[in-house]
UniProtKB/Swiss-Prot annotation:
Family named by the database record: Belongs to the globin family.
One family name in Pfam for this protein: Globin
Protein name: Hemoglobin subunit mu
Keyword Amino-acid biosynthesis in record: no
Binding-site list for heme b: 58, 87
């Protein structure tokens, strides 16, 4: 459960990301593929070039899902249920990859926001993204 202050910090950071989802998402994916090359197996169709159209498109979709989670922080299950079904039942993404993605997301945020991304904001985002990952992995059996 997120405190009112944590929710405000998440919304504050999201306001800085909004409108740049494709760029943040593409950078997140590139960092994930670079640091954890085994994750590329789920994205064989994506080029490892930050301005690649498909990479930007998938980055946009990923961060749109994060944005939906930010908007529905009180009901993540309902907001993310279709995405959870997709990852667990169709794509069969190894749930061990979600913490790797979270780690890379923190680095992308910190690299862009620098001093604005305080320890408290990082903690709030970690708690929030961990909650998102929990919801996304609930459908695994």
């Amino acid at each position: 459960m997120l405190s009112a202050q944590e929710r405000a910090q998440i919304a504050q950071v999201w306001d800085l990301i909004a409108g740049h989802e494709a760029q943040f998402g593409a950078e997140l994916l590139l960092r994930l593929f670079t640091v954890y090359p085994s994750t590329k197996v789920y994205f064989p169709h994506l080029s490892a070039c930050q301005d690649a159209t498909q990479l930007l498109s998938h980055g946009q979709r990923m961060l749109a899902a994060v944005g939906a989670a930010v908007q529905h922080v009180d009901n993540l299950r309902a907001a993310l249920s279709p995405l959870a079904d997709l990852h667990a039942l169709v794509l069969r993404v190894d749930p061990a990859n979600f913490p790797l993605l979270i780690q890379c997301f923190h680095v992308v945020l910190a690299s862009h926001l620098q001093d604005e991304f305080t320890v408290q904001m990082q903690a709030a985002w970690d708690k929030f993204l961990t909650g998102v990952a929990v919801v996304l992995t609930e459908k695994y059996r």
